[in-house]
Design a protein with these regions (language model features):
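Conserved beta-strand segments of alpha/beta enzyme cores
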Residues: 18, 118-120, 173-175
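Active-site phosphate/pyrophosphate-binding segments
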Residues: 44-143
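A short acidic, often aromatic-flanked loop/helix-cap motif at beta-alpha or helix-coil junctions
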Residues: 26-30, 127-129, 181-183
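C-terminal active-site/capping subdomain that shapes the small-molecule cofactor and substrate pocket
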Residues: 133-183
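Short, structured patches in soluble enzyme cores that scaffold and shape functional sites
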Residues: 24, 38, 96-98, 150
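Glycine-rich phosphate-binding loops that contact phosphosugars or nucleotide phosphates
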Residues: 1-69, 85, 164-167
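Short glycine-rich or small-residue beta-strand-to-loop segments that form or flank ligand, phosphate
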Residues: 1, 90-96, 146-152
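Short glycine/serine/threonine-rich phosphate/pyrophosphate-binding segments
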Residues: 1, 7-9, 101-105, 129, ...
Length: 183
């Protein structure tokens, strides 16, 4: 999967290789919709994943469009810009439920790369097993803000840990990012 260039040339010169085109001119991080959509459609077409029912797919796309419009930095409701302003110049800790670990990790890497700040990430309950001790040490709570990824499908025990975390770290600004969807 590429937008052409050298990779396309290499693949076209080999029998059995397949090249799948996506629009050119975008860095991978801004082309994620094209890339992911192409990958999922390929998996459906090859029978590697069961195809979503049309109603389910329409619901997912409608949710994504609504969120895109609400969270847009220019025309949205301002919530993302508000969080960005609060996070500016702060140390960032990303916490996530186990099912959202990859999302927390990706958020950390994007913040590190694109904002030039050092963000760290942890998952619940591992956070409470090892890391929670450090939160009580010295100045660990100074100039730090937390991004907490949760969703309605979390295990009940993880939900209890989230509540405990909110109570224990109540002096630290925590931004709860409630992820939408059923999967």
């Amino acid at each position: 999967i590429s937008s052409g260039g050298s990779l396309q040339g290499i693949l076209e010169s080999h029998d059995g290789a397949m090249w799948i085109d996506v629009p050119a001119g975008q860095p991978p991080r801004s082309a994620v919709g094209h890339i992911f959509g192409t990958q999922i459609n390929l998996c459906w077409s090859l029978g590697l994943l069961p195809r979503m029912e049309e109603k389910e797919l329409d619901g997912m796309l409608a949710r994504m469009e609504k969120l895109r419009d609400r969270l847009d930095l220019v025309g949205g409701d301002g919530s993302m810009m508000g969080i960005a302003r609060e996070l500016h110049g702060q140390r960032l800790q990303i916490m996530s439920a186990p099912a959202l670990e990859a999302m927390g990790y990706r958020c950390r890497t994007q913040l590190n790369e694109n904002s030039g700040i050092l963000a760290t990430a942890s998952i619940l309950p591992e956070l409470h097993h090892n890391e929670i001790v450090a939160w009580g040490e010295g100045d660990m709570q100074d100039n730090v803000q937390i991004l907490l990824f949760v969703w309605n499908g979390m295990h009940d025990r993880v939900g209890l840990r989230v509540e405990w975390t909110l109570d224990t770290l109540q002096n630290i600004p925590i931004h709860i990012l409630d992820c939408a969807g059923d999967s």
